[in-house]
């Protein structure tokens, strides 16, 4: 109360000033909260996958537009995916602290000639290397590369990228203010809680370089999957790298299954299902239900999903 008379109403002053300068823009932004964008009945579904057994299913599954796979799985399934009419993309490392192994880029060039559509890019180092090779137009930016606002989106568009991924931190209201026409949105997956250079496997049992999966339990007995990336470039003939890392994932998967109609109203160009530790059976069931939901059909199963930041956003 003592300080109240010294406070100025910054919000009102700022709104008044902006409204005087750009009335049309303010009106358009205000309207975004009330007028939904055109809802597409059919939206392309892409998938990313980290496991051998699940990737076999995905390459032959109907309703999937394209697949993102790491090096070892592209090596095995590129031709199968192409034969089944899928767009095939190479998933690059989440963290890059060294050059690709010998022979990596030479093989990638051969795959491009064979029909590889492009790359899922997770960091600026990978993007820079591809851009220098004249491959910026084949880059799909993952959610880890900054595209929170329209200015950032315009920057990347000027670089000539293929598309970007909607940030995981924005809520539904914020996404309605974002230009999503060239964006892909993740609607299923285990969200990463932490990328760590401190290997859980090494610190607990010692390093074996076998890219194992572990589980951390909290005091509530919730289980958090941990994936060891001993060979970030995923070339089978390479040794475990010093630049290895772990990703710790959430205990529950994130899923916007019942929200399919609301996602379509955001105007995104495609949606993505991100598979990490799922079994073959889980993968098949989840794909069928999400493809049905986003293509306007009935869903067959019930799931327990977290909604991530879709409802409340990040502060």
Describe the role of every protein-language-model region.
Residues 1-315:
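Active-site pocket-lining/capping segments in soluble small-molecule metabolic enzymes
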């Amino acid at each position: 109360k003592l300080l109240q008379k010294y406070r100025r109403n910054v919000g009102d002053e700022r709104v008044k000033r902006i409204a005087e300068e750009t009335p049309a823009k303010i009106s358009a932004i205000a309207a975004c909260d009330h007028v939904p964008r055109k809802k597409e009945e059919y939206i392309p579904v892409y998938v990313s996958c980290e496991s051998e057994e699940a990737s076999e299913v995905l390459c032959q599954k109907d309703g999937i537009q394209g697949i993102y796979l790491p090096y070892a799985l592209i090596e095995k399934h590129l031709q199968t995916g192409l034969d089944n009419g899928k767009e095939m993309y190479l998933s690059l490392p989440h963290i890059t602290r060294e050059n690709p192994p010998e022979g990596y880029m030479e093989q990638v060039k051969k795959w491009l000639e064979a029909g590889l559509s492009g790359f899922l890019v997770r960091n600026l180092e990978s993007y820079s290397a591809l851009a220098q090779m004249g491959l910026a137009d084949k880059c799909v930016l993952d959610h880890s590369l900054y595209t929170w606002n329209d200015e950032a989106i315009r920057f990347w568009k000027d670089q000539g990228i293929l598309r970007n991924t909607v940030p995981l931190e924005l809520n539904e209201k914020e996404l309605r203010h974002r230009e999503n026409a060239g964006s892909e949105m993740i609607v299923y997956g285990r969200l990463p809680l932490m990328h760590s250079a401190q290997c859980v496997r090494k610190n607990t049992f010692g390093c074996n370089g076998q890219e194992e999966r572990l589980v951390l339990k909290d005091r509530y007995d919730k289980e958090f999957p941990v994936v060891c990336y001993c060979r970030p470039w995923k070339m089978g003939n390479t040794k475990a790298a010093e630049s290895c890392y772990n990703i710790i994932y959430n205990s529950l998967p994130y899923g916007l299954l019942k929200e399919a109609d609301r996602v379509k109203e955001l105007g995104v160009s495609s949606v993505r299902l991100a598979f990490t530790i799922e079994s073959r059976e889980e993968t098949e069931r989840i794909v069928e239900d999400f493809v049905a939901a986003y293509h306007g059909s009935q869903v067959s199963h019930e799931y327990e999903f977290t909604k991530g930041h879709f409802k409340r956003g990040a502060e």
